[in-house]
Amino acid sequence: MNQAALARLIALLMPVGLLGGALGSQYLGGLHPCEMCYWQRWPHAAAILLAGAAFHLPGRARLLTALAALAIAVSGAIGVFHAGVELGWWEGLTRCTAGGALSLDELMNVPLVRCDQVQWSWLGISMAGWNAILSLGSAAVITGLLARDRA
């Protein structure tokens, strides 16, 4: 496997794993995401689509893989921002609120999750922190592999 193919594979598998972990923690683990958690998911979804397309469009594979790496890095940057909010380094851009429910009964049953509250951590690092580390690290690896393959 050449380095561009490895980069493409990482660009697909890393966001699949991270987004899968987020969805699994929500639907299987009972952790309710805050607004910034959702913000981090969208770039991963875009990266999955871009990297998946790279497997089917070989003439555009390098560009699509690079764009997937950029999307992964964007999720990582949002993760850095979110982790900083959780640690009290800075304030978030918005107040995390529950979604707009149609009735009072629905509103009372929607979990309110604050963006500055850590719901889960491992080794003292929150999910947002792990997303930042893994996303930025994998984006750097993908970019490095693409650069070395070109050289």
Task: Briefly describe each language-model feature range.
Residues 41, 51, 65-79, 95-103, ...:
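Hydrophobic alpha-helical segments of small multi-pass membrane proteins
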Residues 2-13, 56-76, 139-146:
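Interfacial segments of alpha-helical transmembrane regions
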Residues 1-43:
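Transmembrane alpha-helical insertion/packing segments
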Residues 20-24, 52, 118, 143:
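Alpha-helical transmembrane segments of multipass membrane proteins
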Residues 87-128:
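Extracytosolic (periplasmic/ER-lumenal) interhelical loops and adjacent juxtamembrane/interface segments
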Residues 36-46, 118-137:
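Membrane-interface loop-to-helix entry segments
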